[in-house]
Amino acid sequence: MKALLDLFKQVTAEEEFDAITIGLASPDKIRSWSYGEVKKPETINYRTFKPERDGLFCAKIFGPIKDYECLCGKYKRLKHRGVICEKCGVEVTLAKVRRDRMGHIELASPTAHIWFLKSLPSRLGMVLDMTLRDIERVLYFEAYVVTDPGMVSNLQRAQLLTEDQYLEMVEEHGDEFQALMGAEGIRELLRNLELDSEVESLHAELEVTGSEAKNKKLAKRLKILEGFQKSGIKPDWMILEVLPVLPPDLRPLVPLDGGRFATSDLNDLYRRVINRNNRLKRLLELKAPEIIVRNEKRMLQESVDSLLDNGRRGKAMTGANKRPLKSLADMIKGKGGRFRQNLLGKRVDYSGRSVIVVGPQLKLHQCGLPKLMALELFKPFIFHKLEVLGYATTIKQAKKMVEGQEPVVWDILEDVIREHPVMLNRAPTLHRLGIQAFEPTLIEGKAIQLHPLVCAAFNADFDGDQMAVHVPLSLEAQMEARTLMLASNNVLSPANGQPIIVPSQDIVLGLYYATREKINGKGEGMYFADTAEIERAMAAGQLDVHSRISVRLKQYEPAAVDGEWEEKTVRVETTAGRALLAKILPKGLPFKAIDRALKKKEISKLIDESFRRCGLKETVIFADKLMQNGYALATRAGISFCSDDMLVPAKKYEIISSAEAEVKEIETQYTNGLVTQGERYNKVVDIWGRTGDQVAKVMMEELGHEEVIDRHGKKVKQDSFNSIYMMADSGARGSAAQIRQLAGMRGLMAKPDGSIIETPITTNFREGLNVLQYFISTHGARKGLADTALKTANSGYLTRRLVDVTQDLVITEDDCGTKNGFVVKALVEGGEVIEALRERILGRVTVDDLIDPETQETVIFAGTMLDEDLVDLIDKLGIDEVKVRTPLTCDTRYGLCAQCYGRDLGRGTMVNAGEAVGVIAAQSIGEPGTQLTMRTFHVGGAASRAAVADKVEGKSAGTVRYTSNMRYVTSAKGEKVVISRSGEVLIVDDHGRERERHKVPYGAMLSVDEDKSVKAGAKLATWDPHTRPIITEYAGTVRFENVEEGVTVAKQVDDVTGLSTLVVIDHKRGGKAAVKGVRPVVKLLDESGQEVRVHGSDHTVSIAFQVGSIISVVDGQQVGVGDVLARMPQESAKTRDITGGLPRVAELFEARTPKDASVLAEVTGTISFGKDTKGKQRLVITDLEGNVHEFLISKDKHVLVHDGQVVNKGEKIVEGEPDPHDILRLQGIEALARYITDEVQDVYRLQGVKINDKHIEVIVRQMLRRVTIVEPGDTKFIKSEQVERAELLAENDRANAEGKIPATIEHMLLGITKASLSTDSFISAASFQETTRVLTEAAIMGKRDELRGLKENVIVGRLIPAGTGLAFHRSRKAQLAGEDIAASRQIEEATAENTTQEADQGL
């Protein structure tokens, strides 16, 4: 009996492990795994269906086919366990050993492993320092390789010889030297490789070499050789002498009916290898001619190649039906491979799926579960209960009862599911709210009922969506589901900390309708004692729900003494509907919170307010009541609409005709040659865009207001009760833009390529479209549908990359103790506060004490988390910048600390240790991805708005200031013309605090003087939006140089107008090739005919024209200061489509260098222009020490600086998108983080999506997690190696402790794909992308995966180190160390540092 118990123990004993290493297997290792050699290609006997002996399914090698039964049937049953049958040689044991017993094939000739040969860069090539082409020639028997030159002087090791050269050498030198062909040759070379001496010589070479390319090559080779050294793997193991054979149950052969077999492709591939191997053995025994043997060896090499990775070299081997066979490599890579299909995504038991329907009667924490589903899902629980209660004696009997659906079973089912939460999931699960737990209530029917308020989180609707149910089984699982996942515990969205349980659609409409006010409604001005009286009056038909009345309401205020609620009765003047709603307000929310027309935004604020003031429980109850009331009220209101509700404004037609007149006027200007084709198009589009908005405005005026007569007989305006208007105004359905299409004018349409068609649709859907208008409409609409399909896939891929890069980021400690942080200000653009300071710092932890600017005393201490009240205080004190902690400056080695992260947005409290903040960040950014557009349409979007700004107006009153880089000249007319590119106008208040700032472009006219006070709405500057002028800062007579027709300028005659203009052309297209590097310039002469010089220098003034500019002056003309010399039509800059939406976000996170990247100043210094070379202009910056830095910039780029300007390091000097890598290099991490955060937020803000900055910062932290070694000092690194930040810090700590020189580094920015692939964990990287490459590299280096991230742990099937798993692993490690759990923290921290040290000393 004891033996039996031991058996069960041995099966279930699970090994605890903390890391996994991967390496190359030596031939002996492979033989030691094997249970016997597979000698024959046969599989099973087609008559007896028994496996052939020594074949691919041989029972002697791999184990019995039936449990405890040998093949010939001599031994059966358990009592013979472990006996080996003497007749058939099969061991009597469990049949499942066929899943893990391996065999082997002894190869008659060694074979190279294709992964190490062909996966780029070729590892074999790097180790031997030979090219891949050469190695292949040797392997596939086209050339000999010298393995031992012996005494022959003109031969080197690893030199290639052709057949003829070899024969010549043999004739000459006989057997003094050795040269081999095929894998044997390569194996010899690898065997003779002296690793230690090679590594030393490489180190020596690295010291002396100068060239960058050589350096890189040597470093790569050194890294591989050191990898072999460290891991103790011999290089010649990359050549296979023994091939392992996969256990047969992992490559099954299944008989189908009709005598055919379904087989795994691997069996075919193995059969080919065995056939060729056996043939080769026979040929060798027969001493066949060399050429035949060679051919056979080559074929063997090819068949082994296809077995390992089919199609990697040459044509893929195909089966009978012409499709490529699936090799071992294909089994593990890609979406259907082992990693993503079986390890990261598994199907689970105890789950079901069904269609969802709405369940408005449910409480927030409930869902309706069909009885039949529940019966099936909770079967084991029911069986148990039936036994315990004595209804059934055996499980079998219980099963019968359940299947027969006896009445008692239903009572027990009710009992079992009480308080047992189930998890509901709707695919695609884009963020953590896509799986939530509910308490099931049993319902008839077959559809799952879902609470309406959680639809937003699941992104569910009831048009046929399906959802899956999962049952948490263990008590711990139930507890976690209940405390963490219950729908009522997830009121806030983890992406932005705002409520996600928000009423929408009908509920909003009902609440809005009930809280609207109607002038002179029935019963207006009545007085009521309490709400019950109101209800009676309404039931009697004496009172309208919208009427203004007075009523006594109970209000609750916290008592001064004990903080209990005190009840007060106050008389309030309000509407009947609002008074009735007051009944459901939780204590702690004042009545004024609902004393207004409740729109969707207001209701969201209301729930937020309730959460902050009254806590979670009250809020959930309140939300449920709001929902029930909203539905009831919407039903009672009976709002519907018809075509008469779409009121077309009478003024529409005159607005349109005036616009048509304007367009005609511009057409006339165009025919007279005053504007160019491009300007005309821009202006026309602007006019129609404006007109559309005007019509919409007039329409909303008419639709949204109605005149009524009040009690005193006066005419007054009030918000209209038009159904369409109410739906849009409340935020229930529809928007102003949609109403505009119904009753205004449809406006401008876009073509599929995003450009705007200049003829707008002047009619609306109410009036109907004609054929042309309908056709123009379909144009853009179809594009929208095509985009949606692409968008979903792209968005999913972005999310996958984001999750992969951040999956191992977990909160691991409370405080890392850093004193660093970022200074945060309000985000201001174009004078508008886009994001207030309070929103950006809410939930962050302060770095410094905050001081009241008035009294200079500390109001908030360092290390405080800023909650709503503190943020209000900061607002009140007028503090305009705060230094806060951020994930980017956190000093925690593996993971993040709670203080740097701040508030957990989904819970509203400080983040807990073990929270997987990385994954949450990735989900928060990825989830709204589907809402982002693929390409930005410029219709009514921000793009078309920004293009036509032609003035700046102050929003607030104050004093005008200019920034230091604002330069202007005063023209003869007294106008101040701006000649700086990046000047800004500020308005400051009386305390000198900046209220707003506006960028002023080059060539603008300033309308205000510095230090003058202005009123709100004052015009600050104006400019022409459609052209960019070139302005002179000096007066004089114009003299053209290099202005030659057909060479540098072209006369352009407009077909329509017949007028000619001089346009600067690219001289490359001019006829003469002799005049390279000349550009048209204007020199200015003074009265005496001398060239005018730049003030304070002897440079002459020369103003160069850019390609494409239209010259406005003629030779010899007198010009004054601030005059325009030429203008550059703006449309040329406008045609470059702004990358928007999803592709823009992906581009930022992938850290791609933009197409037309701008150039940033490398140093702080003074600008000058050097000699031009062909097609390039030379820009020179002289820094403060007098060192010169040159940039070559192509002529068509727009330079933002001018001669003599002083620029700061990192400032833009050429127009374009900045390259994030440059920002990091020149301005550091903070500037980079700010750039990426702002740019990503711009895209999301355009779509109205809110995401907290810290999520983006978390991703940027992961993009910065690797560093480049600049000087290795006394560390183990080599120069320009890339290493993980944590590894570097540990190594530097060690160097410092030993008093050695630590390494110096520079930060590097990796795109998210690169960052995921370069993670320390090879398991995580392999399951992401490029599986082959990752695994080959890891195997050679003998890498060790510490299983720190979440993904690795899911793959190996352990509890993930996040949440409760973090505590579990910590306590487990502490117990292993023989310590009590209290000491586990010190151990955890110490081990993180020690592991790297031990690894180093162990070498």
From Swiss-Prot:
Keyword Transcription: yes
Cofactor(s) listed in the protein's UniProt record: Mg(2+); Zn(2+)
Residue positions binding Zn(2+) 2: 816, 890, 897, 900
Gene Ontology annotations for the cellular component aspect, listed alphabetically: DNA-directed RNA polymerase complex
Binding site for Zn(2+) 1: 70, 72, 85, 88
Keyword terms: DNA-directed RNA polymerase, Magnesium, Metal-binding, Nucleotidyltransferase, Transcription, Transferase, Zinc
Family according to the record: Belongs to the RNA polymerase beta' chain family.
Subunit details: The RNAP catalytic core consists of 2 alpha, 1 beta, 1 beta' and 1 omega subunit. When a sigma factor is associated with the core the holoenzyme is formed, which can initiate transcription.
Protein name, as recorded: DNA-directed RNA polymerase subunit beta'
